């Protein structure tokens, strides 16, 4: 479930990933002096603490190339790349490219420590964020195999299994996580998503309500609740939940896309397009937002505004084929999807 991934993508990269009790001895890097290694890692950590990810990546890339067999070097390279990818002013395509490089770095680190549960879990989350779902599943499975007592690892593996359509195994893992973490909203939110995938939106609404009761101020769960209500045939309730939020929150992609979907469910396609247009205007460097707006305006029958949004996307770096696809949108496609 993307909601939970969004909460933890940075947190997991900060987990201690040194050798655990079940880890094999890491491959040595005989060409790199210990003092040089420690100095490089201190420099990278210092740059990250000072919010200078570009400088951190520069040092980390050199370290990783000089010590390809050292897990610490590969892991901190991945961590620096994640920090760079999460910079708010980075264009969306650049962010995707950097996150893909981070996933590669975490793959290399995880291969050097196959039984390091924390590292495998972190590699899974980064792979998921980079939209490399098969790799993510493999890492989640490795983390859970290394530490089957961890409810967190069961939760993430369960979410991955749900996404792959393995409903029975997903339910087993998610219910185990729920029993182990009764005060956490995350397993309940994941079970709500599983119910929705299984075609039972009413059961999903019940479960997401339980999750929200444990975290009533969570914006992510509020959006998930709105989605469940819309899918259960109550788009008015979905809008009531989301339009009450502050405008900057409503303009964020997850929220604006759900608002647009609710408007479409009500037959208000121009309102849907306007919602996505406002979101795009709030982040002019994000061409994906602009293309969503262009597609929505096409579906609303406003080719002029669609072209304006498409031009904005092109200026932000959108690939030409993506722009053409947005301008070919038909009423069969839902704005914000």
Regions found by a protein language model. Name each.
Residues 18-100, 104, 335:
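N-terminal leader/linker segments that initiate helical-solenoid repeat arrays
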């Amino acid at each position: 479930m993307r909601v939970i991934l969004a909460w933890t993508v940075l947190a997991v990269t900060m987990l201690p990933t040194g050798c655990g009790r079940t880890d094999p001895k890491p491959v040595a890097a005989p060409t790199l002096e210990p003092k040089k290694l420690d100095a490089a890692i201190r420099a990278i950590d210092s740059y990250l603490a000072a919010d200078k990810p570009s400088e951190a990546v520069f040092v980390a890339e050199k370290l990783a190339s000089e010590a390809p067999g050292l897990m610490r070097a590969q892991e901190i390279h991945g961590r620096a790349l994640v920090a760079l990818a999460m910079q708010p002013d980075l264009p969306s395509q650049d962010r995707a490219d950097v996150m893909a490089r981070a996933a590669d770095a975490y793959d290399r680190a995880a291969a050097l420590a196959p039984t390091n549960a924390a590292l495998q879990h972190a590699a899974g989350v980064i792979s998921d964020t980079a939209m490399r779902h098969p790799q993510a599943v493999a890492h989640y499975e490795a983390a859970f195999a290394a530490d089957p007592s961890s409810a967190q690892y069961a939760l993430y593996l369960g979410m991955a299994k749900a996404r792959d359509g393995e409903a029975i195994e997903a339910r087993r893992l998610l219910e185990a996580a729920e029993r182990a973490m009764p005060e956490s909203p995350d397993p309940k939110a994941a079970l709500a998503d599983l119910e929705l995938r299984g075609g039972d939106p009413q059961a999903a609404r019940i479960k997401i309500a339980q999750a929200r009761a444990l975290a009533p101020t969570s914006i992510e769960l509020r959006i998930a609740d709105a989605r469940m209500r819309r899918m259960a045939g109550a788009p008015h309730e979905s809008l009531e939940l989301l339009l009450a939020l502050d405008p900057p929150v409503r303009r964020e992609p997850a929220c604006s896309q759900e608002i647009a979907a609710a408007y479409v469910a009500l037959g208000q396609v121009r309102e849907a397009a306007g919602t996505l247009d406002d979101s795009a205007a709030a982040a002019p460097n994000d061409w994906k937002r602009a293309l969503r707006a262009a597609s929505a305006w096409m579906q609303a029958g406003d080719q002029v505004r669609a072209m304006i949004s498409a031009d904005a996307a092109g200026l932000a770096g959108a690939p030409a084929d993506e722009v053409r696809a947005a301008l070919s949108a038909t009423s069969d496609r839902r704005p914000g999807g």
